[in-house]
Every structure is written in structure tokens, then in C-alpha cells.
Amino acid sequence: MVRPVDLRKKLLAFVDNSLGRDTEILLPITFVFEKYLNVEVKFKFIWDLLYIKRWQPDIILLPNIRGHNLYVEIANFSRKSGIMVLALDSEGNFNPNNAQHYWGYNYQQKSIQEWVTCWSQKAFEYAKKFHEKEDQKKIVITGATGFDRYIFMPKSSKSKTLTQLKATHYQMVIGYAGWAFGKLYNSQRNHSFKNFFPENRMKGLEWLEGQRLKVRDMLKSAIEAHPDVLFVLKKHPKEDFEDQPIEGLNEMNELSHYSNVRYVKNEISIEELINVSDIWTGFETTTLFEAWLYNKPTIILNNDTNFPRTEHYKGSLIAKNIEEFQAMITKQKETKDLEQLLEKKILGKRKTLIESAIGFQDGCNHLRAMYFFQKSIVNIKDSKNVSLNMRHLRLYLLMEIGRFFYKKRLFIQLPGFRKSIYVFENRALPGLEQRKEKVYTALDKFHHKKGLHHFLNENKWESLWSVLNKN
């Protein structure tokens, strides 16, 4: 049995945004650390690297160590300083034949963290291909913690969400999850799409632009043909780069002027948008899995499978053109049962597809991850050697001094200052504490409802693990 932490340890979690995917991945983990392991937790913005020196944490927690260069820098610096690094994974579906795609910004292509958490058995097998033999023992299957909220969070009322959208008079809602086509109009587009069509980059980019226009036109035709239907278009959370606050063209923002369209960025959570929708759609998005967890019918606006994609299209309706999309909307209007169009065997595949992608759908993936993380607590070093890093100091001074001069309207006009808009808008992590309180409250109720709090209170992790594996 692993003993609970007797002297209060400190955990520092870094995120690049106060709300959204990465934050949702970490909050269930920090809840268990705080409530059951008596660990002090703080969240910081990723530019606040100097806080590692100032606070001297025992544990660094990250949503991933490949999706952002600063996540990798934080992990490397912390490990060299004698601080334990724990990390999850923001994306569990990757190309099994492309090491560069797997490692991302982790150019050394070596695991830095204590455990390499995988969403599924399939991801586990793929990950082993990219890790040296000595690191393969770190690779474990936990499921995707960010998907747990679709099970443990209470569903927001549709009327409340429609009120937020200022659209209470609509009886039918169609949601669309954006694909980050806006990166095509970004100065870093070649870096963004380097793993797409590597044999002919320009041809691939031209193909993507063609797909953007096709999806835009499908949405536009549906919006114009169904003025009584509300279309909620959700921008991809990772579409924008830090140095380009001016949005590039995507498949949605040319449609935002229609009265029956709401173009949403981060104002409303993705689970609330899925919940309010009668149909959930996308070009290529793992949110289709999330829609299935809410028993929502799903449509893919893309019939071309000749590019890297997950297998969720095998469990969704596919609209190949404008006419098919229109017919599906009409079918839902008339019958309220769009998925009559799907064969029963396809609907039956969804459970398998979900498990293949995100591992488990019981809301307990965060506990599977914590089963491994808590094993490492006894290995926390009593002594640390956190040196003063001049780059971290410069970033801190830029933020501290710059905040006195920051004016968004001015900075957006100055190319050299545009990157800093992202920093000043996000450094304080606005809204995080409110979201944290909601998630923590929901998790506490969920653990009690499932009878899991007894294991956690009594530190019976092996018994808990046995229960989780039976489900």
C-alpha cells in the first residue's frame, strides 16, 4: 500500500489557456491530488516558467509533452532541477508510422515524464514503437481523462445554453465542430501541416483549401435553406497561433453574419454545445465520440478518407454533398430520428470505436491515471536544485512590465506586439477558478454516487484498480 503524503507536497500545473481541452484534462487529476492526497495545487500560464524557481514545487503536471514547445521546455527544466514530471496526453490518436507526428515538439524523442499515459490499447501498441526499450515500462493505458467530464459533469439545461447564445426561439439546433482550416492562412502553415501529405506539401495544402470551401458551402446552403434552425459553429481551440491574433479564413467565419448562426470560440464549453444540439457535425473531429456519449446523431461533412483521420466516420452518417446534408436535416426535422438512416450494425460499432479511441467511457479515466501517478509520490526528491534561468526571468519581466502598457486595440495594430496579446489575455487564466469549482463539485458527487470515495479516503488504490478493471 502506498502511504498518503504526510508532509504537504506542492504541485504546479501549467496550461496554455484557462478554459478548454488541456484544462479539462488536468482538473480531474488535480482534484484527486488536492482532496485525497493532501497536495497543494496551483495552476499557471505557460509563460510563467519563473514560478518554478519561485515556488519550488515537488511535482509538475502537464496536459502533454509534445503539443507545445513550452510544455517540453517546462518538462526538461523541471526534470533537470530534480522535480517530478507527470503528464497526460491531449491527443491519443496518432499516425503509427510517423515518429515526428508522435513526438511533436519533443525533438529529443525521449520520454521526460514518469509515466507515458495512453488513451487505448491501440495507442499503447503504437507508443511502444516510438520508445526505447528502457522506457517502454513507463507506458500505461489510462483512457482519456478529458472525456470523463461527459459522464461526471451534470448536463446544462438547453434553455440556459440557448439563453447564452441569445437564441431561445429556435426549436432545432445543429452544431458543427471546426477543423482549424484557419491555419492555412497563418504564417506557420507549413509547420502546421508538415505531417500532411509530406511527399507533396503544396498539393496537400491545395486539397485542404478545396475541402474548406466545400464544407463552407455545405454549411452555407443549409443555413440559408433552414432559417428556422440555429447553427452553432464552434471554432477549433487550437486553430490560432500565438503570433497571429487576427483570425484567418476558416470554414465558418464567413457565415457568422447570418441571423441563425452563432460563431462560438471559448465562450461556451464544448459539452454544453453538444448537449444543446439535435445533430452534431464536423469535417474531422474527435468530438463525434463525445457526441455519442450524449447519444447525439452525428454527420461527417467529408467523404474523402485519403488523409490522416480517426475511424469515427465508420459510426456516423456521411454527407458527401449539399443535397445529402439537406436531406439529413429534413429527416431529423420530420422524424426526430435521423439515425434510422444508419444500419444497426454501424450503431453497434460505436462502443468499439469509442474504446479503440479513448479507452473507457465510465468517467473514471482520471482514476486510472491517478493509480499510476500516486505510485510515484514516494519517489519525490527531498532536495531540488532549481537554478535561475535567464530566459524565464526575461519572460517574467516582459509580462510584468508590459501589463502597464498593454492595450489590445493598439497592440493588434503593431506586428511586433501581436504575439503578446495572447499572453496578456491569458496570463491570469480568467475563468479557471470558476470552472475548477464546478468540476470539483461534480467529481465529488460522482465519486460518492459510484461508491469510489471509500477507496480514495482509505488510500486503497489496489482495491480501486480491481473495481475499475471489472467495469
Set out the residue ranges of the language-model regions:
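Catalytic binding pocket for nucleotide-activated donors in carbohydrate/polymer assembly enzymes
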Residues: 248-256, 286-361, 422
